[in-house]
Each structure stands twice: as structure tokens, then as C-alpha cells.
């Protein structure tokens, strides 16, 4: 079979209703857009296999010598699962880790700028938009952080309104996107909102990772019709897709077929059927071309069987045994390399590359920002506050539980007496207050885990700095959600329990509970940062607090702990909080009825004063004995927050 016979075209003349025909004016517009070319793209990753003692690292080839040109229009990357289409898309969008990556990606013949990922648009497969905000509020956030500060608010609002109108979101512009607790817009409208977030910057190149995933056939078709209209405005739209139906396939301008990291076809989508027909794979009538191509690649198509029967005798006579055993994918890749489509692509690639010879892709991890740190901090804090108010289930539930626990504890330990039983009751209730603050702070793990995908996408796209996001979340979520419950808990329990009737003692207790809550929450952030599953972070937090409780000072007298384990007490958050609360409450108290501490009266009780109790517990009764606990908690807050920030900063943000 000669390679020259591959150049066969089967035009797909029928078109969908509602799609305008391409006019000469459209062609002129398309030629003025951005042309992305990729030259000899190879990508390998190192994979660890085997068990712990027998683990070895092997290098796996993901993409091998991929070449092509993406022009203004709809450029589809099609292939089976694991074929490398998402990897190729991420490489073209400069969102793939450059380790193991080689080749060139050019824009109109020039290297991509270092901040290409910030100037282009990228719509991820899972729609990462804030569900508690309206469509317009999400777009306002994108415009505020991605558009230059030289633009006025009026100009930004005009851009937002234009994008809303262009994507047909007028009717739902002021509706919430929706969460699992809040009813919002439809799946198609949510996908269009994700696209609108990227169109705010008016990019010439738009990347989409499987934009039809999770949508029904009608909604998926509507999304692709929208992309088709956008492509006619001169945009280069590049997207991966798994198994489109026929009406969607007909919209494609360019088709790239990948399998096992090899290029099966790259060229005009309407000529793909003709190409495969020319090499012996005939599509049955009424079969979806996209399904037909995937069947060929997977080797389970009737066309493959017919092809093997037709060329079987010829292969037996002319081919060597090693050639007959060549896998189908290898044969298809070889067919394409010998085809006229590949030769035409090489001519275009040589025109773009010119005489420049580049060895490998540079590391495109640079991220640029259109706004300042303070501007980003303001908008992140504002969005987080709106998210808190728009999703009140968690916050209200936490406040209700706080009030309920405060009343229950107040009823159980109501009006503590200054007698020996009061010593035990005070020690018990102060221990409960401390541990309750710790375990209530476990909810802080969700602060960074739930929004991990949103954070990674927005950071790579140049919305904000890591520092802006981190401090914005602290100001809007962590501080109010830990401070308010501590204030409420103190106000309810302090007077019901009948603790020391001094103003300074009341505020010291409130401060101590806040510090314990902040320390525990900071520890939760340090553990949760970078985690993808809330349950894992919660489990680690719970185990840590259980061990900390042992060294808090109630369950075991810390003076009796063996030296080689006693150092663990200095890592216990409850220990510092519990010691501070005991110092604040017991100092100056008299627990022996009728005992005059100013005289030499004797008493039958082992402990009569608060000082004696504190000394027995190994607590320093000096003023520094109180405040050193707050200093220790403050140091732990700084250390844990630093760990959380560094984990966010060095989080693997590129796939």
C-alpha cells in the first residue's frame, strides 16, 4: 500500500442548524489570530514501582515526538483514556511540570512569553468557581484581579457585561452558581461561567480540558456551539475531548488523534475519515466518526477486522515476521508519518521555526500579577466573607453547638463552691474548656483542603500571590470563626460556673481560650495545607490532639513523667492553655471553709489554697508562670502558620 494514496478527502457538507457558514470575512479574521505550533514534543515521567524495600524508579513515556499546528478555530484533541491528550493540552498551555519535557511551543513563530499561562485562558475539567457567589460576582473577582489597574471600574463593568451577553448568561447573572447545599444555575450555565472567568482578559488562545464532561448531550452540544461562535471571532480554541457525538464532531476545524502518546492523525477534521479510508479503515454507514476513530485505535472496530482480512495475505507475502507483529498503534503512527498530512504540517512547522534551533522548552513557571498585594488581599478577604455569609450552615452550626455546650457545661458545673470538691470540679471543667477549643478547631482543616483546586487554578492563572491568598483566608475565615465562639463560650460559662469574680480574670480566660483556638487552628492549617482529602487531615488532627491531651496536666502529673518522654509536654497545646486557665482561676483562692490563711490555723485537708494546688501540679505561681503559656501559644501559632504558608508556597501546582 503506497503512502501517496492516503490523500483522500471525504467532505462533510452537512452542517448543524444555527451554525453560520464561514465567509471570506471570517477567513480573514481567522488568519489574524494566534497560531500555536508545537515541535517534537516529548514528555517522560519517573514512576516508582514495587514495595517499600524493593521500590525502583522507571521512566515512562507519555508523549513521543508530537508535532502540529493549532490555528484560529476549534482544535480538538481526541483519544482514549490514558492516551496523553490532557498531558498535551497542559504542555501547550504551559501548565505541565517541565521536568522530563522537551520540544518547542511557539506562538506565531515566536517563543511563548514566560507568563503565557497568565495571558491565555484555561478552563479546567471540574468547574472551579465559588458556588456561594453569583455569576456576576465571580466575574467581578476575575476582573478585579486580572485586569490592569489602569482600567476604571466602569471599563471593567463594561467588560463583564459584554462577556455575560456574549455567553448568554444574562438571565442568571445575578443568581448564585450553587453548591451541594445551595441550589444554583444549571450544569451548562456553570460551565459557561467558568469560560466567562477566562474570557475576562480577552485571551487570543483558550484551552479547555474536556469541556463536555458531566454534561448531558444537549448541554454539551450547546457549549460547543458557543465555542464555535467564539472561534469565528478569531480565537484559537484548543480542547481535549473524550467521545463527542456526531453533531459535536462536525463543529471541529482541526483534529488531533492521540493514542499511547503517539500521534495517529493531525489535520482538518473533515478529512480524517478520508485519511483512514485511504489506509484501509472504512467507516460503516451511520457510525459516529469519533467512535470510529477510537475503535480503530483500540483495535475493536469491525473496520480493523476487515482491514486485517484485506491486507492479511499481502502482509504474509511481503512483510517480515517482525513487521507483522508490530502493534496496531505503531502501524497507525507510521502511516501518519508517511502521509501527506504530516508532510504539509512539517512544511508549516519549518516556516514557523525558521533557522532557530532550540534544544528544549524553558521552565515556564513564572507567574505575573496585574494588581498589588494589598489589592489582592482586599478582594480575597471580601470574597471569603461573602462565601462565609452565603454558606451559613457550617458557621451557624458551630455557633449553635458553642451555645449548647456552654449551657450544658454551665448546668453541670453550676456555681462552683470553694471547698475540696470545688478543686476537682474546677480542674475538670477547665480541662474540658481547653480540649473543647482544640477539637472545635478541627473544622479549620477544610479552609485549605476544600478550595485546593480553586487555589491552584487561580494562582497559576495569575489571580493572586500565595501570600495574598493565605493572609486573606486568615483575616476573613480563621480569625472571626475562632474568635467569636471563644467570646460566646466565655460569656456563657464564666458566670454560670461562678469562677473568680474579677474582671481581669474574665478577660484572661477569654484571651486564653482564643489563643488555644488559634493555636489548634494553625496546627490544622499546617497539617491540611496540600492535602486533597479532608478525612485524612481530620484523622491526623484527632490523633495529634489525643496525644496532646495525655500531656495536658490532668490525666498524668507532668512531674512524674519519665525524663525521656517528658519533653513531649512542651509540644502540647492543651497543656499551655490548661496551665494558664488554672493559674488564672486558682491563684488567691481559699478552699478550706473557715480557714484564716493569715494565721497559723491548721486544716485536715491536704490542699487548702490555690497556691498549694498549683504548686502540686508543678505550675509556677509567679506572674510569668501565667504569661509564659500565652507566649508559648503565640510561638506555636507563628510556627504552624509558617509551616502552612511554606507548604502552600511549595505545593506542586503543575501537573
Curated annotation (Swiss-Prot):
Q: Which reaction does it catalyse?
A: ATP + H2O + xenobioticSide 1 = ADP + phosphate + xenobioticSide 2; urate(in) + ATP + H2O = urate(out) + ADP + phosphate + H(+); indoxyl sulfate(in) + ATP + H2O = indoxyl sulfate(out) + ADP + phosphate + H(+); sphing-4-enine 1-phosphate(in) + ATP + H2O = sphing-4-enine 1-phosphate(out) + ADP + phosphate + H(+)
State one Pfam family annotation: ABC2_membrane
Gene3D superfamilies per the UniProt record, alphabetical? P-loop containing nucleotide triphosphate hydrolases
Question: Where in the sequence does glycosylation occur per the annotation?
Answer: 596, 600
Q: Which domain of life is it from?
A: Eukaryota
Tell me which PROSITE patterns the record gives: ABC_TRANSPORTER_2
Q: Where does the chain cross the membrane? A: 396-416, 429-449, 478-498, 507-527, 536-556, 631-651
Keywords assigned by UniProt, alphabetized: ATP-binding, Cell membrane, Disulfide bond, Glycoprotein, Lipid transport, Membrane, Mitochondrion, Nucleotide-binding, Phosphoprotein, Translocase, Transmembrane, Transmembrane helix, Transport
| Entry binding sites for ATP | 79-86, 183-189, 210, 242
The subunit structure is: Homodimer; disulfide-linked. The minimal functional unit is a homodimer, but the major oligomeric form in plasma membrane is a homotetramer with possibility of higher order oligomerization up to homododecamers.
What is this protein's name? Answer: Broad substrate specificity ATP-binding cassette transporter ABCG2
Originating organism: Bos taurus
Gene name, per UniProt, is: ABCG2
Amino acid at each position: 500500500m503506497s503512502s501517496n494514496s492516503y490523500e483522500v478527502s471525504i467532505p462533510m457538507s452537512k452542517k448543524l442548524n444555527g451554525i453560520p457558514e464561514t465567509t471570506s470575512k471570517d477567513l480573514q479574521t481567522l488568519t489574524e489570530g494566534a497560531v500555536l505550533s508545537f515541535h517534537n514534543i516529548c514528555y517522560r515521567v519517573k514512576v516508582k514501582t514495587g514495595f517499600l524495600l524493593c521500590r525502583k524508579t522507571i521512566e515512562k513515556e507519555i508523549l513521543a515526538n508530537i508535532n502540529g499546528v493549532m490555528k484560529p478555530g476549534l482544535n480538538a484533541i481526541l483519544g482514549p483514556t490514558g492516551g496523553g491528550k490532557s498531558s498535551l493540552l497542559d504542555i501547550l498551555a504551559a501548565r505541565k511540570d517541565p521536568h522530563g519535557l522537551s520540544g518547542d511551543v511557539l506562538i506565531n513563530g515566536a517563543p511563548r512569553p514566560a507568563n503565557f499561562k497568565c495571558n491565555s485562558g484555561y478552563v479546567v475539567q471540574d468547574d472551579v468557581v465559588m458556588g456561594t457567589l453569583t455569576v456576576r460576582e465571580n466575574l467581578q473577582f476575575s476582573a478585579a484581579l486580572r485586569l490592569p489597574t489602569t482600567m476604571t471600574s466602569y471599563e471593567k463593568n463594561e467588560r463583564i457585561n459584554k462577556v455575560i451577553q456574549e455567553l448568554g448568561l444574562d438571565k442568571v447573572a445575578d443568581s448564585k452558581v450553587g453548591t451541594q447545599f445551595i441550589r444554583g444555575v444549571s450544569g451548562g450555565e456553570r460551565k459557561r461561567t467558568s469560560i466567562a472567568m477566562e474570557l475576562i482578559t480577552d485571551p487570543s488562545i483558550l484551552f479547555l480540558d474536556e469541556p463536555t464532561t458531566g454534561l448531558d448531550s444537549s448541554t454539551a452540544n450547546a457549549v460547543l456551539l458557543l465555542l464555535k461562535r467564539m472561534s469565528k471571532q478569531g480565537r484559537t480554541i484548543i480542547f481535549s475531548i473524550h467521545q463527542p457525538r456526531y453533531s459535536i464532531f462536525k463543529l471541529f476545524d482541526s483534529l488531533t488523534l492521540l493514542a499511547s502518546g503517539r500521534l495517529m492523525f493531525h489535520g482538518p477534521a473533515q478529512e480524517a475519515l478520508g485519511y483512514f479510508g485511504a489506509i484501509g479503515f472504512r467507516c460503516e454507514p451511520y457510525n459516529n466518526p469519533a467512535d470510529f476513530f477510537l475503535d480503530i485505535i483500540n483495535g475493536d472496530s469491525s473496520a480493523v477486522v476487515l482491514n486485517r482480512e484485506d491486507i492479511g495475505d499481502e502482509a504474509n507475502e511481503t512483510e517480515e515476521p517482525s513487521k507483522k507483529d508490530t502493534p496496531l498503534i505503531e502501524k497507525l503512527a507510521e502511516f501518519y508519518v508517511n502521509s501527506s498530512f504530516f508532510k504539509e504540517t512539517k512544511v508549516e512547522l519549518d516556516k514557523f521555526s525558521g533557522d532557530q534551533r532550540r534544544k528544549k522548552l524553558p521552565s515556564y513557571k513564572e507567574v505575573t500579577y496585574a494588581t498589588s498585594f494589598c489589592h489582592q488581599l482586599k478582594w480575597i478577604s471580601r470574597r471569603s466573607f461573602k462565601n462565609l455569609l452565603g454558606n451559613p450552615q457550617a458557621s451557624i452550626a458551630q455557633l449553635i453547638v458553642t451555645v449548647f455546650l456552654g449551657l450544658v457545661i454551665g448546668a453541670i458545673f453550676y456555681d462552683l463552691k470553694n471547698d475540696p470538691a470545688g478543686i476537682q470540679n474546677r480542674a475538670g471543667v477547665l480541662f474540658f474548656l481547653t480540649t473543647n477549643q482544640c477539637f472545635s478547631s478541627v473544622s479549620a482543616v477544610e479552609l485549605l483542603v476544600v478550595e485546593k483546586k480553586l487555589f491552584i487554578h487561580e494562582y497559576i492563572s495569575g489571580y493572586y500571590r500565595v501570600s495574598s491568598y493565605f493572609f486573606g483566608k486568615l483575616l476573613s475565615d480563621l480569625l472571626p470563626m475562632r474568635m467569636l465562639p471563644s467570646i460566646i463560650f466565655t460569656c456563657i460559662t464564666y458566670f454560670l460556673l461562678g469562677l473568680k469574680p474579677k474582671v481581669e480574670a474574665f478577660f484572661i480566660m477569654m484571651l486564653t481560650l482564643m489563643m488555644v483556638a488559634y493555636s489548634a487552628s494553625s496546627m490544622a492549617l499546617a497539617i491540611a495545607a496540600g492535602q486533597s482529602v479532608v478525612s485524612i487531615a481530620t484523622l491526623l488532627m484527632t490523633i495529634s490532639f489525643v496525644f496532646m491531651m495525655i500531656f495536658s496536666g490532668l490525666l498524668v502529673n507532668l512531674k512524674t513523667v519519665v525524663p525521656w518522654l517528658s519533653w513531649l509536654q512542651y509540644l502540647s497545646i492543651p497543656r499551655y492553655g490548661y496551665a494558664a486557665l488554672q493559674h488564672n482561676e486558682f491563684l488567691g483562692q481559699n478552699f478550706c471553709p473557715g480557714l484564716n490563711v493569715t494565721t497559723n490555723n491548721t486544716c485536715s485537708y491536704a490542699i487548702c489554697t490555690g497556691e498549694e494546688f498549683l504548686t502540686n501540679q508543678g505550675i509556677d505561681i509567679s506572674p510569668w508562670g501565667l504569661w509564659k503559656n500565652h507566649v508559648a501559644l503565640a510561638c506555636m501559632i507563628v510556627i504552624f502558620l509558617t509551616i502552612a504558608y511554606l507548604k502552600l508556597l511549595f505545593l506542586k501546582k503543575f501537573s
